[in-house]
């Protein structure tokens, strides 16, 4: 395919659009982008004001929106039903002053605007992440409000999931359907984040029902289990792909095991290959890994806390493909290896 940008021309066999929420690749590729339009315009500003003592620090809900006053000069505010603010419009002191008075109801005079940015809760997602040799990742595939900071983890997760699968496809050693699993694994995660961002917007409304929902949320977050649940969901660490398998770790991000020599799992998966980590130093597992040649790295070492496992097979993106307890099931391990790294090398099988 050929991409022309001004006087430059780029050619490649594959194209991955990671070019943001207004993605040129997505539009040129004809990807359908569906979702919900914004209900508010958000502003994050640094200002100088004549009478800062009129404002109290903290989050404040009002009939027209909400604002957070963190320290003198720093304001974040959301205006519902105030009309869309076009991103190409200049953000002037007069505009920020008018919005702040509408939202806060406070007769505070802003005297200087140092920094300003706007954002919305527009939530859209591509109905497909791949068309032939063109793929989407990050904000090109999905957009949502920045509340909770979920977009960074979401986009990085796309890149980690896609990168090794595309590399395997280009090398020619990918098993059937590997690249399609990018869509089946990542699209539901994106949809879930969009729904969570919509739920956050519902709670921000001034309606009595929204305040009741917020009170329930606060009660839940005040508990250890509730706080853990919400933190894991927002940070993405509770994610589990449906990869089959009988162990609860399969489909989850692998724990960063520390081996007895101090090496950590994260250091062992930076080469883009699968990793078979054998805590029991088992000859049959070493032989199994060797059947995949250079596609799977075999490491035999105990760990300081192996979580009751005898061995674990980890994909290049850090997710567990297979986990064994006590006497490992070699057939199950081989099936997992074939699913993610292709069939074993016939020459190695016969040797």
Task: Show which residues each predicted segment covers.
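Core Rossmann-like FAD-binding/catalytic domain of the broad FAD-dependent monooxygenase superfamily
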Residues: 1-214, 218-221, 347-351
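Helical substrate-recognition/capping region of FAD-dependent monooxygenase/halogenase enzymes
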Residues: 98, 102, 168-351
């Amino acid at each position: 395919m050929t991409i022309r940008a001004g006087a430059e021309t780029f050619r490649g066999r594959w194209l991955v659009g990671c070019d943001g929420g207004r993605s040129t690749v997505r539009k040129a590729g004809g990807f359908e982008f569906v979702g919900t339009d914004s209900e508010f315009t958000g502003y994050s500003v640094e200002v100088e004001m004549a009478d800062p003592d009129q404002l109290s620090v903290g989050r404040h809900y009002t009939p027209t929106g909400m604002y957070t006053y963190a320290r003198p000069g720093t304001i974040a505010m959301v205006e519902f039903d105030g009309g869309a603010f076009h991103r190409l419009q200049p953000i002037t002191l007069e505009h920020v002053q008018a919005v702040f008075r509408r939202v806060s109801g406070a007769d505070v005079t802003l005297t200087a605007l140092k920094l300003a940015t706007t954002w919305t809760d527009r939530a859209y997602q591509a109905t497909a992440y791949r068309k032939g040799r063109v793929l989407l990742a990050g904000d090109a595939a999905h957009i949502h409000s920045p509340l909770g900071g979920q977009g960074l983890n979401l986009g990085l997760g796309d890149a980690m999931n896609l990168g090794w699968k595309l590399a395997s496809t280009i090398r020619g050693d990918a098993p059937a359907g590997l690249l399609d699993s990018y869509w089946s694994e990542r699209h539901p995660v994106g949809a879930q984040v969009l729904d969570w961002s919509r739920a956050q917007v519902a709670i921000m409304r001034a309606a009595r029902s929204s305040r009741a929902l917020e009170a329930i949320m606060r009660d839940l977050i005040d508990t250890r289990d509730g706080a853990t649940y919400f933190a894991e969901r927002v940070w993405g660490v509770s994610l589990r792909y449906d990869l089959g398998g009988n162990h609860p770790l399969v489909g989850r991000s692998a724990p960063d095991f520390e081996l007895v020599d101090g090496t950590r799992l994260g250091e062992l998966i930076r080469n883009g290959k699968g990793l078979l980590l054998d805590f029991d130093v088992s000859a049959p597992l070493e032989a199994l890994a060797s059947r995949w040649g250079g596609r799977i790295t075999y490491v035999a070492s105990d760990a300081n806390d192996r979580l009751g496992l005898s061995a674990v097979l980890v994909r290049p993106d850090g997710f567990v493909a297979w986990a064994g307890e006590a006497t490992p099931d070699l057939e199950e391990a081989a099936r997992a290896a074939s699913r993610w790294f292709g069939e074993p090398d016939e020459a190695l099988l016969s040797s």
